[in-house]
Amino acid sequence: MGSTPTIILAHGFWGGAAHWGRVILALSRLGHKDLHAVELPLTSLADDAERTRKMIAQQSGPVLLVGHSYGGAVITEAGNQPNVTGLVYIAAFAPDAGESPGGITQQDLSLIHISEPTRRRGI
């Protein structure tokens, strides 16, 4: 049986590492022991990915990356390290190679169908 991976959590743009506190507690109760929330500097995607890569490099075994919102773009950029075994996206950006989170949000959304009940609620 393989070793349990270290789990590294990357927060969203308006968050911080501390926002993962309840998730870390819940995962700990489920038996996960090696849990880390990376504090992203939020200066650029490149800087945030580099900070995450540094945390990945500090781990001796397999790593599972989890990204929420903007953190999804970060783990996409940082997740090509040899010891990364998987990427988990939670309501997150999952950009294609070379695509930025900003590019995703600027896409033409005019083709999205909004259902009638949603329109009635003013959404």
Feature map (PLM): residue ranges:
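Conserved hydrolase catalytic core segment
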Residues: 64-98
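Short, glycine/charged-enriched secondary-structure capping and boundary segments
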Residues: 22-24, 51-52, 78-84, 101-106
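Active-site catalytic motif of lipid deacylating hydrolases and related acyltransferases
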Residues: 2-61
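A short beta-to-alpha transition loop/helix N-cap that caps and shapes the active-site region
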Residues: 16, 45-47, 93-106
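Histidine-centered divalent metal-coordination motifs
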Residues: 11, 68, 113
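Single conserved hydrophobic/aromatic residue that forms the stacking wall/gate
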Residues: 112-117, 121-123
